[in-house]
Structure formats: C-alpha cells, structure tokens
Amino acid sequence: KTACIAGRFFMGDENLSGNFDGIKTQKFGVEIECTGLTRNAAARAIGRVFDSVPEHFGGSYDKYHICDSKDRKWAVVYDSSIRRVDKNGGNASREYAVEIVTPVLEYSDIPLLQEIVRAVRSADGVTGAQYNCGIHIHVDGAPYTAQSLRNLVNIFASKENFLFDMLQVSPMRETYCQKVDRDFLEMLNKEKPKTIEAIQKLWYRGDMDEVHHHYSSTRYKACNLHSFFANGHWEMRACNSSLHAGVIRSY
C-alpha cells in the first residue's frame, strides 16, 4: 500500500496504483544535509567514489563540484540551518555544515547514490533531526498537467498524516516541512483550475512576483510547489535525513 501511494505521488496519476514502470522512468534529484565532517572532506569522499578530484568554486555557498563518469556534476554546499558538530560531537565551525546535491538522477542511479551515502558516512558524516538535517527529494515536473498537479496535492493532503507517521517526521523539523495549507487546498478544489498558471496564482495568493524569491515562505511545505513553479520540479521535504543506504533507497 505504501509503495502504491508513493508511485502515485511521484507521477501525479491516479491510475498508477500497482504499476511501477512510471516510477522507473521518473527523473529526480536529492539534497542530503549532514555534519560531522567538513565540506572539503565530504567532497573528497564523493570524489573517491568517482576517482575524480573535486573543484572548489567557493562563493556564498562555498560550493564544490565533483564530476561522475557521465560528466554529471554532484555538489557539496553550505547550509546555514544545520546544527554543526565535529566527529566527536562538539560544536564546530560553519565548515561542518554540509549539503550534498545530486545531479538529475534516474532509477538506475539509486545504487550509485547509496554508494555516495556510504562514502560520506565512512568519512565521519552524521545526520538526523537532532542536527536540524533533512533530505529533500526533487521530482521532475515535466510530465505534470494542471489536473495531475491537483491530484498530487489532494493525494498528499489525504495521506500526509500517514506519511508523517511512516517517515517519523521529527517535530524539530516541522517548521521546514509544514503540511498542506488548508486554505490553498480548499480554493484548489473549489475553483478546479485548468492551467498551471492558475494553480500558481492560488499558491502565492495572487502575488505572482513571489515565484522569483528563492526563499519564499511558501517553500517550507512537505509538498513544496514553489520549487515546481520556480524551477520545474516539485519537492518532497518530509524525509528525516539519513546516511543509511537502505533508508535512502526506501525514500
């Protein structure tokens, strides 16, 4: 039952129950927040998986790029929300705030993602709600129509209590992964918008300029459509962070 619900979430299609072919063709990306090691150490750990030397670009996010065998760029960046610790659990500098950002992935890349997670954990990476860390899954929005986007929101809203229980979402993280806004849901089902633009107007309560604000307050939803309107992919923010390869695969 859980797997069927997940399939419907990812494809936004009510007819996918029991059919996982759609999931296997869905493109996605993942952001994993962690600490216990520096960004440089995390980048080097990922580089060892690919036999690749990280490039340090710096900037406000202190970005590192690591190329894989398909010339895709994996990134390690700074995230200010993380509670930073060193490998001994003591308070640490901002160098220990680590966010791993994957390139666009496919189903066949999941074992590779698991290998990356194992490498970071072996390099002293730690994570979890106690460090204010989460995992964000970005799902390609290209297949979505206004109807399937409405379906996504309604399925999510109807099952989110179950999902929060199943995923054991920490109360410490609920500020950053709020449940579906009930006013938005009510207007969505009352007006039944026929276009993506009309749904966007409801999401931003008429303030269409909000789509250009990266840190829009609307982004802190477990089912984040700000990411869809701004970048073309919706975001699932309800997953507690983990560096356990099996947990990553289950997400």
Across the structure, where does each feature detected by a protein language model lie?
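Positively charged N-terminal leader segments that act as targeting/secretion signals
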Residues: 1-10
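Short, conserved phosphate-binding/catalytic loop or strand-edge motifs used
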Residues: 131-135
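C-terminal accessory/tail domains of diverse enzymes
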Residues: 11-129, 142-251
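Histidine-centered divalent metal-coordination motifs
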Residues: 136-140
